[in-house]
Amino acid sequence: MEGQLNLDCERFQQITQMAKMGWWESDVKNQQYICSDFIVDLLGLESHRISFQEFHHRIREDHRTRLRNEFISHSNLETYEQMFPIQAKNGEIWVYSKISFRKPDKEGYRDIFGYLQYVDKPAEN
């Protein structure tokens, strides 16, 4: 059983590397995101935590208001998907993020988790 679990974990890591994606979860109480190694490396972070404010400021300015408004209007749904440009360690990149909302805890905080995936720049319409 333990051998199969290790094999599954290795396969999952290989697949996420191939897909250029990593996981994250929110710490609403402390206003931070906790990020996987992939996201830490992609964004050039110094630790596995980034404040909501710092992450928001990395999003290209012409997308910030739209994303904030969509997030607020969709926060009562179970999942939410978005694509946006963000400042990474090697310049601006495009990412796709899928979010899943958790039920509020005893203190009323509603943490979220999801994944962030590097994508080629979308075609201009």
What is the predicted role of each segment?
Residues 1-10, 117-125:
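PAS-associated C-terminal cap
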Residues 4-56, 94-100:
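PAS-family sensory domain signal
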Residues 16-22, 73-83:
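PAS/PAS-like sensory domains
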Residues 26, 85-93, 103-104:
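PAS-family sensory domains
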Residues 50-72:
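PAS/Per-ARNT-Sim sensory domains
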Residues 97-123:
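Short loop/turn elements at sensory-signaling interfaces that couple input to output
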